[in-house]
Amino acid sequence: ISVAELLAGDIRANANRAGNMLKGVFYVCTICGNVVHALGEGSFSCCGSTMFPQEAEEPDADHAFSIERIEDDWYVTLDHPMTKDHYISFVAYATMDGICFKKLYPEQSVQPRFHITGRGRIYLYCNQHGLFTSLTPRK
């Protein structure tokens, strides 16, 4: 329960999402870029502001990333601006029982590798356009 909810008397029950990491929710601070991944909805704040859940969308033409198997890894690539004002903040690989984050920074290329631990989803967050997702290919 957040302090704001407690003071307002607005207490909401958190629905259990059965602990499946693929059903998790991403929250991103619009000020500093801090990221929270939660298995259910929550009330999070950062830098004095409320963090809102991000809705993952299918990649558009500017955010269409490729997922390629190289040995025992998923190799994710995307040709995207990586300037201080417009960049990919993180790429994550989620399966039913785990999640792995790769934090990216301006002027760094978007080429993370993730050890394959099962079928899952790749999530990619653009600081200007939001969260995008795609299923990993079948092994």
Residue ranges of model-derived segments:
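Residues immediately within or flanking Cys/His clusters that coordinate Zn2+
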Residues: 26, 43, 123
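Short cysteine-rich clusters marking metal-coordination/redox-active sites
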Residues: 29-32, 46, 126
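Cys/His-rich microdomains that often coordinate metals
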Residues: 36, 50-51, 130
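Cysteine-rich micro-motifs
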Residues: 40-51
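Short metal-binding segments enriched for Cys and/or His
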Residues: 52-65
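Structural beta-strand segments of beta-rich domains
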Residues: 72-76
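Exposed aromatic-hydrophobic patches
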Residues: 77-78, 110-117
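Edge beta-strands of extracellular beta-sandwich domains
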Residues: 128-139
